[in-house]
């Protein structure tokens, strides 16, 4: 089961890298950023598709998108000098609270136990 969480982590990391390289490509010369973006976003969806085999889709997607937005915003401020207003901070805080609620509200599905065949004599 841990492998699926690792795959989700890889999906998040490649999504962040792909989205940041999209911004980098738009402010720099050449096509390297666009190629990196294409590869990373493609890998992100591949990793996510494997992760949802054992992780609930709602949880996986919320974590993928939410953590991605959180780190993309943080790195955009650090790398590209984008602004971080009080309203953005409030939105990110709400996002994190939503992710926590979705994750904590998800129950693990139990597998049905096998019935024992009690034949009548």
Swiss-Prot record:
Catalyzes the excretion of spermidine. The keyword ATP-binding does not apply. The chain crosses the membrane at residues 1-21, 32-52, 55-75, 82-102. Forms a complex with MdtI. NCBIfam families: PRK10452.1. Keywords: Cell inner membrane, Cell membrane, Membrane, Transmembrane, Transmembrane helix, Transport. It is a multi-pass membrane protein. GO terms for biological process: glycine betaine transport. Pfam families: Multi_Drug_Res. The keyword Cytoplasm does not apply. GO terms for cellular component: plasma membrane. It is found in: Cell inner membrane. One of its GO terms (molecular function) is spermidine transmembrane transporter activity. This is Spermidine export protein MdtJ. It comes from Escherichia coli O127:H6 (strain E2348/69 / EPEC). Belongs to the drug/metabolite transporter (DMT) superfamily. Small multidrug resistance (SMR) (TC 2.A.7.1) family. MdtJ subfamily. It comes from the Bacteria.
